[in-house]
Every structure is written in structure tokens, then in C-alpha cells.
């Protein structure tokens, strides 16, 4: 039966499982390119306030038609309360999130910005636990795994921030120098990935991850009362643009900052808006719907590896011992958290099956575990389907 279903979902003879893996690998390359392109944009002098404004305008233009036509029936009437919630989501999920990311990226490097993002699932879990949105069962392996994973992520972020360490790889001496000589017209405008203030950059990236995690946590109750994901994202983008414009009005006084001075600058903004916010959004929502949230999250470290290769070639990025150690700890922590979430779903599925069985036979049975947990936190766009995991 499963094989027949898989065959029906095949495209040009390619089974859906393989489609999902190809899509996720492609998605990581798209996101990895965004890290490198964003750093290149900063190297070229694009304003940290102008860049996100243009990026979110493009994203909003891409999202609006889909939100309007696909969610006509399920979109509730807009109220002042909803507008306030969307404004708050934009403040943490767009303005703080993207602002801290660009500040952190400007002071560190694409690879370690990507490495820090691997800690978001653990920070989200910790934040939800502290707010009592999610319960922690320390007497079960899923609870222990999530606590251990969170501790590893915190340790990794601390190592990256507090210990830079010696340089263990410098591509500029061979590969990057050769490429820069033979392709100077292409690579020269990109600049390099030399960090300015490593510790400050890492603090900014921690702020980025905290903002991202807070956005995930607080978006869950909003989606319960306003179950139109595309519309919520569109409103969030809109208010994010307004907030960045207000900040730019006070902090960005140079009118030339809003003008594109080269084709490279235009390319970086189009890439960020179309690929990172448009195409990637569509691919991710399909992969989550068909493969489940854990399947999608497992591929995140692949992005870090791809970023390292891209940044080394295009920007001549150097790698530091502290960054490598921290990245390994964070990725290990990510997988512990994902394992804990997977085990949690198994417990929930067993409990649900037991309840259904009891109802069918008219017999009252004890739950599978009196400590069974009901997950109450939902990552945006993360459907619970795990058909292909």
C-alpha cells in the first residue's frame, strides 16, 4: 500500500522520497548561497538597514498573491488585536531577527553564522520550557535528550563567542588567491570574510537566534487563532518593512544608500528576496508537509558545510579552532534535540493509539505513560506529517 502511494506521488519516475531528499539538498544550497551573498552585500557597502527593506519588499510581493488566493476561505476577518500581534511578530521575527543577523554576519563569517543557527531548535525548546509552553520529562529519554542537546548548544555557542582560537585553515594562500587572480572581475567585488570584532559578532548572532526562537514560540498561539500561515507571514513582512523604514529614517541619513551602484548589489538583493524568501519558502513548506519537521531540520548542518565551502572559495574565509569546536558541539546538540522531539512524537502516537483502542472497545485503559507529553509548540510551517521519514 505504501509503495502504491509512493508511486502515485512520483514525478517523472522519481519516487517522492528521493524527490524530498533532492529538494532538501537543493534548499541547503539556496540558503548557503544566501549567507555568502549577504556577506558579499555587506562587503560591497550595502546598508544593513536598506538590505532587509528591499529583501522583505520582494518577499512580500511574492507572498501576497498566494496568500490572497489560496487562503480566501480560511483567513479570519482582521481585527486590531490581530494587527497588534502581527506587529509584535514582525518586531522579533523580522526586525530584530534580520537586524541582529546582518550585524553578526558583518563581524564574523558566513560559516559561523550558519553554525550558530543550528542552535535555534534547542533555544526554542529552552524558551518554551521556561515559559511553560512545553513540559520537560526528565524521567524519559526524550526529555533527557532535549536537555542534553540544549546544554551542548549553549556550550557550543559559548565556545564560539569566548574562544576564537588560532587559525587552522587559510584558503587565501592558495585556492582563493588563484581564483581571485584568474576571476578577478567576478570575485573581487565580493570582498572577503575577514571578521571585524569576533566576540561582538557572536553576541549579535546569539541575539539573532534568540529573536528567531522567540518568533517561533510566539507565532504558535497566533496561528491557532489566525490559521492562515501565508497571510500571517505576509502581514509580518509588511510590518517588518514599516519598522525597518522607521529605523532607517533616523539612522540612515545618506540617500545614496538606497541606490544600487552595481549589478552585484542588485543581484544580492534579488537573491535574498527571491531565492531565500520566495523559492526557499515554497520548497520548505512542501518538504515539511510531506516529510515532517524532523526530516527538514536534520538537513540544517548540511547547510553549514556548504556555506564553509562556498565562503572559502568566494570570500577566502578563514577557519578558527574555537569556531570549529563550537560548531561541532552545536550540531551534536541539534541532533540530540531532534532525537528527543522524535521520541516525544512516538510517545504521543502510542498514547493516541491506546486511547482510540480503548474507545473502540469501550474499555477504560491507562495511558501508555502517565508522563506522556502533548507537544504544544509549533514551528511555523511545520506540519506533523511524517509519511516519508
From Swiss-Prot:
Q: Which residues form a coiled coil?
A: none
Tissue specificity, please?
A: Mostly expressed in stems and hypocotyls, also present in seedlings, root, leaves, flowers and siliques. Ubiquitous, mostly expressed in vascular tissues and secondary wall-forming cells, including developing xylem vessels and fibers.
Single GO cellular component term: plasma membrane
Specify the domain of life of the species encoding this protein: Eukaryota
The UniProt entry's GO biological process terms, in alphabetical order, are: auxin biosynthetic process; auxin export across the plasma membrane; auxin-activated signaling pathway; cell wall organization; defense response; L-tryptophan biosynthetic process; plant-type secondary cell wall biogenesis; positive regulation of auxin metabolic process
Modified residue Phosphoserine is at which positions? Answer: 372
Cysteines joined through disulfide linkages: none
Q: What keywords would UniProt list here? A: Amino-acid biosynthesis, Aromatic amino acid biosynthesis, Auxin biosynthesis, Auxin signaling pathway, Cell wall biogenesis/degradation, Membrane, Phosphoprotein, Plant defense, Repeat, Transmembrane, Transmembrane helix, Tryptophan biosynthesis, Vacuole
Domain (EamA): residue spans on this chain: 32-161, 210-339
Q: Which SUPFAM superfamilies match?
A: Multidrug resistance efflux transporter EmrE
Knockout-associated phenotype: In stems, defect in cell elongation resulting in dwarf and bushy plants with altered mechanical properties, as well as little to no secondary cell walls in fibers, including xylary and interfascicular fibers; these symptoms are partly reversed by continuous light conditions. At the flowering stage, red, dry and bent downwards stem apices. General repression of indole metabolism, including tryptophan, neoglucobrassicin and auxin (indole-3-acetic acid). Broad-spectrum resistance to vascular pathogens, including the bacteria Ralstonia solanacearum and Xanthomonas campestris pv.
Single GO MF annotation: transmembrane transporter activity
Membrane-spanning residues: 18-38, 49-69, 76-96, 111-131, 143-163, 198-218, 230-250, 266-286, 294-314, 319-339
Tell where it localizes.
Answer: Vacuole membrane
Recorded topology in the membrane: Multi-pass membrane protein
| Biological role | Required for secondary wall formation in fibers, especially in short days conditions. Promotes indole metabolism and transport (e.g. tryptophan, neoglucobrassicin and auxin (indole-3-acetic acid)). May prevent salicylic-acid (SA) accumulation.
Provide the family line.
Belongs to the drug/metabolite transporter (DMT) superfamily. Plant drug/metabolite exporter (P-DME) (TC 2.A.7.4) family.
Instruction: Write down what this protein is called.
Output: Protein WALLS ARE THIN 1
Gene source species:
Arabidopsis thaliana (Mouse-ear cress)
